[in-house]
Amino acid sequence: LVALALNTKIVKISKININIAYSSKNKEYRESLLKRSIKQSIRSYYETLFCLSRSQKILNKSIFKVENRFLYSQTNRDFGLILLSAHNRSVDLLLNQLTIQEDVTAIFKPIKIKALNEYVRKNRQKSGSSVFETNFTGVKELFSALKRGEAVAMAADQVPAKNMGVYENFFGRKVYTTNLIPSLHSKTKATIVSVAIHSDSHTNQLYIRYGSKSAYKEKSQYNAKTMNKEIENIININPEDYNWEYKRFKKQEVEDRSIYK
């Protein structure tokens, strides 16, 4: 599978992204990271299929441990909770594990194949989450959930639709970035806690790690720049866990149409 993957478009995009994100690293480091990343991407695809096809009882055994749970459990919930994540391993498995603790409202980009989209949506909701497409209705549902003091989750590392973002720094490039989470935070006073699935580099066991916490009362304003920095922090814990095959740098403040050609 790895040999096959090394000849695909996925590898080309991943290589470009890794070279941008870790331009200060030497060639040997970047090439090694690329190979390890492809292996972990294949594994994360399996994790998604596993998540969508197995019973909740089996899925509950898939995570080895949870780090910094106190960031989640000791949060004032009067204004709701925003769980910030990125496409680090399987977002489906992460959402599933988050909803074991409580109901979570999340948004996602629909899959073009209608039947597959409905299948995925149905299975994403089996553990108690409410999922909506990334559109006006979906955003409205996020606001409503926060107003009720509930939790919402979003992977905020993809290029947003036109007029739905701002240009902000991400691994040294000014890229088009969603401003939805900063907007939700500003309008609802909800606390933001970052969370992602990682793999242990020694044992390959999966674990969930809660990262930083940002509250509305803090002096520094939470914005897209702060959000992107936290996503970088998530990725840098174990860069091979990140799904580098997405064209994250395709829309930059300084246009570069040839970047993925």
Give each language-model segment a name:
Residues 63-65, 113, 132-135, 174-175, ...:
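A conditional alpha-helix N-cap/helix-loop micro-motif detector
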Residues 1-85, 118-122, 126-128:
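Membrane-anchoring hydrophobic helices of lipid-metabolizing enzymes
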Residues 14-17, 94, 119-120, 138, ...:
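Hydrophobic alpha-helical segments typical of transmembrane helices
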Residues 79-136, 162-169:
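Catalytic core of membrane glycerolipid acyltransferases/transacylases, capturing the structured
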Residues 6, 130, 218-222:
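Short, surface-exposed alpha-helical recognition segments that flank or form part
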Residues 41-43, 65-66, 90-94, 112-114, ...:
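Short hydrophobic/aromatic-rich motifs at helix boundaries and adjacent loops
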